[in-house]
C-alpha cells in the first residue's frame, strides 16, 4: 500500500491520515466544479452597460441684447456642458450660428442633427450627441400641425411654428443597442396648440418599434403633473424620468428668466421615457458663473440605462 500524507510517529494513525487525505481530494474536485460552474454563469450574465447621460436644455436663442447676450452666456454654457458631459442633448431655441458655436465648444467628438423650424434661418430643436458613444442610424423632422411634412406649417394657432426632431441612435458601448430620441419645443402662447401637438407626438410614438427604448426631451411650456399635455403624453405609454429616478437632485422651477431660482417650482422642461428605461439619478443643473446663467432655463439631466 502506498503511503499518503506526511509521516507520523504513531503507526495507528496512518489509516486515519490516509482516509482524511482522500477526503480533500473529493472535496477539492467538487469545489473546482462549483467554481467552474460559477464562472460559466458569470460569463452568461449580461454585462452591465455604462449609464447614458441625457440632457434637455432650452438654450435661449442667441441675441446681442444685454445684459444676457450670447457673447456673455456662451462661455458659461461651454463650462456647464464640459462639466456635465452629456451623451445626448435635446436642445430648444438654438439658432444656426449659435448651434455651430456650441458644436465648436463641445469639441470634435460631438455632432448634431437639426433643421430650422421655419423657411429661413430660424430656431431649431437640434439634438447633439457624443460620437464616441453614439452613432445615428436614422432621423427625421416633422412639424406640429395638420401638415407635419410641410416646413414651417402652423395650423393650430400657435405663436410660432413648432416641430419635432427625432433620431434613432446605435449605442457603441452597449453592443450596438438602438434607441430613439424625440426632441421638441411646444408653443408658449396656445394651450390648444400644445394639446394638439401632444396628440400628434403620441400618435407618432405609436409608430415606433415598441422593442426600442424611447426618450422624449423638450421644453413643453406646461408644468408637469398640472396640465392635459402632460397627461396625454403619459397616456401614450411614457413615464416621467424625474418621478422614476432612483435618486434626484434638488427640485427647481426649470424656467427662471435670469431671476432668483425657485425651489420646488414648476418643471416645464422634461425627459420622458418608455417604462423599461431605468434612471439612476436625475437633477436640475443650477451652474452659473459670477451670477450669470447660460440660459433663462435650467438644463435637466438624467443618468440612465436603457433596460
Enumerate the predicted regions with their spans.
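N-terminal, active-site-proximal structural segment of metallo-dependent hydrolase catalytic domains
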Residues: 2-19, 26-105, 117-122
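Acidic/histidine-rich helix-loop elements
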Residues: 56-74, 144-158, 187
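Solvent-exposed loop/turn segments at secondary-structure junctions
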Residues: 59-63, 94-98, 117-121, 133-134, ...
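Metal-dependent phosphoester/phosphodiester hydrolase catalytic core
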Residues: 135, 171-195, 207
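Structured beta-strand-rich core segments of catalytic domains in phosphoester-bond hydrolases
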Residues: 40-46, 88, 92-178, 284
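Metal-dependent phosphoester-hydrolase catalytic domains
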Residues: 9, 40-43, 192, 206-214, ...
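Soluble non-cytosolic domains of exported or imported proteins
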Residues: 67-72, 93-96, 158, 188-196, ...
